[in-house]
Amino acid sequence: MTSNNPQPITDNGQLKILHIDSNHPLLKEQLQESGFINHEDFTSSKADVEKKIHEYQGIVIRSRFKIDKAFLDKATNLKFIARVGAGLESIDCEYAASKNIALIAAPEGNRNAVGEHTLALLLSLFNNINKASNEVKSGQWNRESNRGHELDGKTIGIIGYGNMGKSFAKKLRGFEVTVLCHDILENVGDQNAKQVSLEELQQKADVLSLHIPWTPETNNMVNQDFINAFQKPFWFINTARGKNVVTADLVSAIESGKILGAGLDVNEYEKLSFETLTGDMPEPYRYLLNSNKVILTPHIAGWTFESHQCLAQVIVDKIKALYC
């Protein structure tokens, strides 16, 4: 994503870029080779960064802190913000756009990783991989209680058919499944997924995989009413954003059998940085930790060695496309 009106480079032809999160070395190296001036500050507080941000025309971030209105007001010379990741929820995008600051993200950089991880969660759920492995390691040899399900013949529903949703659908091509997608944009369906209304998806899906950003419109979208609108019990996968789901309602649906199992790479209780959970441990989260119907991973769907490099390359290419 970029804004439509990026500002021109500085008079001497060089932009000063502040990197406030560590990333793959190629990002800084290639920008340096292209004539950009690069400074790093991975430890200063937001307040301390605000004191010097006026010196820079560009900033490269992941999710260390929020780029809010107060920060942007101090960034008087900022021309672009590049986030090494897919989402931009840590940035006040509307206010940045009002200041003609270009916004750059890299969903292309980790879409393959997310697609693979989503499929891994689904297959693990269907075949009780985690549960069976833990039992064998503890000396139990339980075959019948770990009898699994096959994907063939199932209908997979994907909500959010952008980079991540399309990647997951592509991974499903080797299975005899029906893939449906729903998106707020029209005409995004392709040879891998048929675009349908939300109502049709809820009527037909055996599996729901979420691939939407976290916005005011999607916040708490997966709640009791949303879940109950599904005609059949279903498996639920979330590799998108945790705050799109009301965890207490998810737990209730698992307990009632409406949701057969959940694979969650993200959860409602993550901090904005995605590096840690919030300090407390609410009861719904305790349930997720103890349920053998739930698989949890720590927001690593897009976190591979390959995507680490690819994300950086996408950001470099997009910055150079605007300013070289």
Model-derived segments and spans:
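Short, Asp-centered acidic motifs that coordinate Mg2+ and/or phosphate
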Residues: 57-58, 80, 207, 235, ...
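Residue-level detector of alpha-helix initiation sites
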Residues: 66, 87-90, 105, 109-110, ...
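An N-terminal-biased, well-structured beta-alpha scaffold segment characteristic
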Residues: 4-104, 201-203, 223
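Rossmann-like dinucleotide/phosphate-binding beta-alpha-beta segment
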Residues: 13, 33, 144-232
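Rossmann-like dinucleotide-binding domain for NAD(H)/NADP(H)
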Residues: 233-236, 241-324
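Phosphate-binding beta-alpha-beta segment of Rossmann-like dinucleotide-binding domains, i.e.
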Residues: 99-101, 107-155, 167-170
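Short glycine-/small-residue-rich Rossmann-like dinucleotide-binding loops
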Residues: 64, 86, 212-214, 240-241, ...
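Beta-strand-loop-alpha-helix segment that lines the small-molecule cofactor/substrate pocket
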Residues: 72, 76-79, 91-103, 210, ...
